[in-house]
């Protein structure tokens, strides 16, 4: 494990508002492209620190190693101190949801609002668990990323058989179409596996610290179904679980518009 004090994440500073928002993007993205809608709609309310997470964007060359909660807490602790940030809000989309949850767990006493958009980390898909948690399976997963034709062929067969949705198949094709993207997927799946959460305990911690959690899902999202976030949704007030009429790719934009209404 690297020395956290020597590890910094690149970030993009967006907006000019008085409130602070730490924002964590989805897989295969970077901070600025993911959170441009937040800058456009919320930039007058927030100064947004949109991070390039490990193995993504300007952080693509970071060493492949397991990211633990303690490691993440140390990195953010240093970031907050250097930038003189005391209180803040957080946002996480898709993969970035894991980092939003890890941030909430570590800094609940300094957070006011959490915006989770189709977040990873609420539950764990069996395929992810199989591919990332066991050494033999990780070896097979690594091989499949180095030799993608078989993997894509099986995915195509499942799509034609109606076992996976066409939009999910297109997403798989898009995120695996270059060796660099496949390496990013492998590094992220394997190295983020320690970011797991007891959702009931985390919600209790948020409630104790008066943190408001807003959970957004897309009605037409085929990548993250509502069942994947049911554990958290069941705990939230009805007006903080928001189902938007959109799919996965437009969810950040739609959520930004919804959040903007909170300031009116």
Predicted regions and their residues:
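Conserved alpha/beta-hydrolase "acid-adjacent" motif
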Residues: 222-228
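Gly/Ala-rich beta-loop-alpha elbow adjacent to hydrolase catalytic centers
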Residues: 92-96, 100
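Flexible "cap/lid" loop of the alpha/beta hydrolase fold
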Residues: 105, 114-145
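Active-site loop/oxyanion-hole signature of alpha/beta-hydrolase fold enzymes
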Residues: 49-91
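Short beta-strand/loop motif that positions the catalytic acidic residue
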Residues: 209, 215-217
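Conserved HGGG/HGGXW glycine-rich cap/lid loop of the alpha/beta-hydrolase fold
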Residues: 14-60
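Conserved alpha/beta-hydrolase catalytic His-Asp/Glu region
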Residues: 146-207
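Catalytic histidine-centered segment of alpha/beta-hydrolase-like enzymes
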Residues: 244-256
């Amino acid at each position: 494990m690297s020395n956290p004090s020597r590890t910094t994440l690149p970030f993009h500073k967006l907006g000019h508002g008085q409130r602070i928002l730490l924002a964590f993007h989805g897989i295969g993205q970077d901070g600025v492209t993911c959170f441009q809608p937040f800058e456009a709609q919320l930039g007058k309310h927030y100064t947004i620190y949109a991070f390039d997470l490990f193995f993504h964007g300007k952080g693509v060359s970071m060493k492949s190693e397991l990211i633990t909660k303690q490691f993440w807490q140390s990195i953010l602790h240093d970031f907050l101190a250097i930038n003189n940030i005391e209180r803040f809000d957080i946002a996480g989309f898709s993969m970035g949801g894991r980092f939003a949850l890890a941030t909430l767990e570590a800094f609940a006493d300094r957070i006011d609002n959490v915006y989770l958009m189709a977040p990873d980390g609420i539950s764990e898909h069996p395929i992810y668990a199989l591919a990332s948690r066991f050494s033999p399976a990780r070896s097979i997963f690594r091989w499949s990323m180095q030799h993608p034709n078989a993997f894509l062929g099986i995915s195509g067969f499942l799509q034609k058989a109606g076992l996976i949705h066409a939009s999910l198949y297109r997403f798989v094709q898009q995120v695996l179409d270059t060796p660099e993207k496949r390496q990013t997927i492998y590094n992220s799946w394997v190295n983020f596996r320690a970011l797991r959460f007891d959702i009931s305990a985390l919600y209790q911690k948020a409630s104790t610290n008066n943190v408001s959690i807003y959970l957004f899902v897309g009605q037409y999202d085929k990548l993250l179904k509502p069942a994947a976030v049911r554990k958290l949704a069941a705990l939230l007030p009805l007006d903080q679980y928001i189902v938007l009429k959109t799919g996965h790719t437009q969810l950040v934009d739609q959520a930004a518009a919804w959040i903007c209404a909170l300031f009116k």
